[in-house]
Amino acid sequence: VRFTSCDAVLAQARAVKSEWELEKIRRCGALHAKVLDEILPERIHPGMSEFDVARTYVEAVFACGGSGMLRMNAPGEENFFGYASADTSGIYPTYYNGPLGCKGMCPAIPFMGNAERLWQKRALLSIDMGFNVEGYNTDRTQVYWSGAADTIPGPIRRAHAVCVEIFEQTAAALKPGAVPAAIWA
């Protein structure tokens, strides 16, 4: 008996989504947006710890029907939600292949957020947490500012403008048949 890997065939099959699957992803994205755009801004505030922000996110996800588990087709990339990082905590080193890091709950659980790190006034809070409905994920990194829009420093405004430009270019490249790895490169 000779065994042969079928990973490539499975990856090709998973790359093409049916309308049924696309609807699951759209529903997941709509619920994810509701949590980040509507629910969280009403519930989080400066003075909260990263962990408390993460817990607030988790409560909202479950209340909206999310499963809480993110499964991705890569080694070591099955995780529970993600990160809430206040200010420079987001540059904390991590093994995760994503835009954000954080100290986490403890060295053994480098996710969610740290209970001792507080979100200060006039500071950034970055949340890189996914959403899953029935096995279909959406992922989004959301940045909040704890102050009036006119108090955002120039360097942060410029960095945001670059991020928006990258987002728009990437979105324009995402068309049926496009290979995400080619866009990522």
Predicted regions and their residues:
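Active-site neighborhoods and metal-handling regions in enzymes and metal-associated proteins
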Residues: 1-185
